[in-house]
Amino acid sequence: YKCFPGGKFKVLTLSYDDGKLEDKRLVDIFNKNGIRATFNVNSGLTDMPIRLPASEWNDLYDNHEIALHTCTHPTMNRCGSYEIAREILEDKTNIEKIIHKPVRGMALPNGAGNKLITSIAADLGIKYIRPATDQYAVVKSALEYANDCEGPILLGDENGFSMPTDYMNWIPTCHHNHNLVEFGK
């Protein structure tokens, strides 16, 4: 059997994008309950009123992972090789300067990826990507469906929670919808 730190056989991974102000409340809930998550931030968008300033990342996300979400959040499969490399490398470099730790992971903006993006990201030191296939239509459809749905929206392996077979194409199992907090109460 595969075993995780502490002799655990199962793990829960949570991933949140964009470094928004709402993360403060979310991190507080996670910290009170001993839950850790990955927060995928955009170093080039921290001056927006809905985003957390980079100066708050170290304190807020302490005990959580910070991963990149590209510098300016473009739909990456619409970008050329140079822009893909620049978006990833600039975000990775900026974040590492702020948090003084290596950045290993990445979430693709709008879920849009392809083999070129995966290859460039790997060459730049990225160890995992969520998701790395073109899931944009799937995610958009799920979000539209969520308006009339109760509970989480399944995106990946709805019959189980297997370990990813390809960390550079880490498809999520489900996506939070607008009622998820209420369902958890």
Q: Where does each model-flagged region fall?
A:
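N-terminal pre-catalytic segment of deacetylase/amide-hydrolase enzymes
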Residues: 1-14, 159, 169
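Catalytic grooves of carbohydrate-active enzymes
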Residues: 7, 19-20, 98, 166-185
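Active-site-proximal N-terminal segment of extracellular/periplasmic enzymes that hydrolyze or transfer
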Residues: 7, 11-15, 23-34
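Active-site metal-binding loops of divalent metal-dependent hydrolases
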Residues: 16-19, 70
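Hydrophobic positions within alpha-helical membrane elements
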Residues: 22-23, 74
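Aromatic/hydrophobic pocket-lining residues that form the small-molecule binding cavity
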Residues: 23, 84, 88, 180-184
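Metal-dependent polysaccharide deacetylase catalytic core of the NodB/CE4 family, i.e.
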Residues: 31-117, 124-127, 133-151, 155-171
